């Protein structure tokens, strides 16, 4: 699309006409789209004018720094993915993953108060929201994949150090820390933290998912921990409501210790910002004694 046509379309949007913008733009995602997902919503918006044009009854607003859309599906569906494409295209950077978030609702629910932190040059955006039937609202298959032993829920292979044979931190995804002992990852709205380390000889045991109907500000799950199901490593993923660009990370920890003397272990989720979906990948090793920590990580997990 040439610049004249692009400016003409943006002009129509700014005067309240709903026109799909089709040219190169910067893409932002929450969640992961699959071909069988249903389109719940699609619209184009101008990002410079307030009040913005209401589409299908969903309220929206613009200020100097943010665009906000209040979406709630009238179908019996839960949100599986959200895509925002902004125009014109600007060089992307690693910080983009934090510029789109749901203040309330989100993946796994039927609503999202969608907040987009704009840049000055961005003047229009397409928004696409997808969903799946609410009766089950399971995303396990799309985040486990075909090879959960070797590939994480971001689609990245687990990599190991030579000294211990334990997995190493990711360096090609946004990373944050708390108290220098807890590491959090974040991409496309999907958060992650890991409890202890994955060893090359571990086995993938199961994936436990917790959907929105079972999630509170504080909740827990019970995991088996005996014989061949002795827990060696947990890879924990979730979506959460985020009030600001800087999220408040949850506290995820065992209730007490998870030692080889425990037949079960309780994993506790203690949150300030409500989760909307969680997935725990459980890895096991009958030889694990629960001491898989490095000196610099004391206090982690």
UniProtKB/Swiss-Prot annotation:
Domain of life: Eukaryota
Sites where a glycan is attached: 262
Keywords for the protein's UniProt record, in alphabetical order: Blood coagulation cascade inhibiting toxin, Complement system impairing toxin, Disulfide bond, Glycoprotein, Hemostasis impairing toxin, Secreted, Signal, Toxin
Signal among keywords: yes
Gene Ontology MF terms: toxin activity
GO CC entries: extracellular region
Locations listed in the record: Secreted
Signal peptide bounds: 1-23
Reported tissue expression: Expressed in salivary glands.
Disulfide bond residue pairs: 52-60, 78-137, 102-112, 258-265
Function, in words: Sand fly salivary protein with antithrombotic, and anti-complement (alternative pathway) activities. Is a slow, tight, non-competitive, and reversible inhibitor of factor Xa (FXa, F10). Is specific for FXa (Kd=3.86 nM) and does not interact with non-activated FX, or all other enzymes tested. In addition, it blocks prothrombinase and increases both prothrombin time and activated partial thromboplastin time. It also prevents protease-activated receptor 2 (F2RL1, PAR2) activation by FXa. In vivo, it abrogates edema formation triggered by injection of FXa in the paw of mice.
Subunit (UniProt): Interacts with factor Xa. Associates with complement proconvertase C3b-B complex.
Name of protein: Lufaxin
């Amino acid at each position: 699309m040439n610049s004249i046509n692009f400016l003409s379309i943006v002009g129509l949007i700014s005067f309240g006409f709903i026109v799909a913008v089709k040219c190169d733009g910067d893409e932002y995602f929450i969640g992961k789209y699959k071909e069988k997902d249903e389109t719940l919503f699609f619209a184009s918006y101008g990002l410079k004018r307030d009040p913005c044009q209401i589409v299908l009854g969903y309220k929206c607003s613009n200020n100097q720094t943010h665009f906000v859309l209040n979406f709630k599906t009238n179908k019996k569906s839960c949100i599986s993915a959200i895509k925002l494409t902004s125009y014109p295209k600007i060089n992307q950077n690693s910080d983009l993953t934090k510029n789109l978030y749901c203040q309330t609702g989100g993946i796994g629910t039927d609503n999202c108060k969608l907040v987009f932190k704009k840049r000055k040059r961005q003047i229009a955006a397409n928004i696409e929201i997808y969903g799946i039937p609410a009766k089950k609202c399971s995303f396990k298959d799309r985040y486990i994949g075909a090879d959960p032993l070797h590939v994480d829920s971001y689609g990245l292979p687990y990599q190991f150090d030579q000294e211990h044979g334990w997995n190493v931190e990711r360096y090609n995804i946004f990373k944050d820390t708390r108290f220098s002992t807890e590491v959090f990852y974040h991409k496309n709205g999907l958060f992650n933290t890991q409890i202890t380390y994955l060893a090359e000889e571990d086995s993938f045991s199961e994936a436990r998912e917790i959907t929105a109907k079972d999630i509170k500000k504080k909740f827990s799950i019970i995991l088996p921990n005996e014989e061949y199901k002795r827990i060696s490593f947990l890879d924990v993923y979730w979506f959460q409501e985020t009030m600001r660009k800087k999220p408040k990370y949850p506290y995820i920890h065992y209730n007490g210790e998870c030692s080889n003397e425990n037949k079960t272990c309780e994993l506790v989720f203690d949150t300030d910002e409500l989760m909307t979906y969680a997935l725990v990948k459980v890895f096991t090793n009958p030889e694990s004694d629960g001491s898989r920590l490095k000196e610099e990580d004391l206090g982690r997990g």
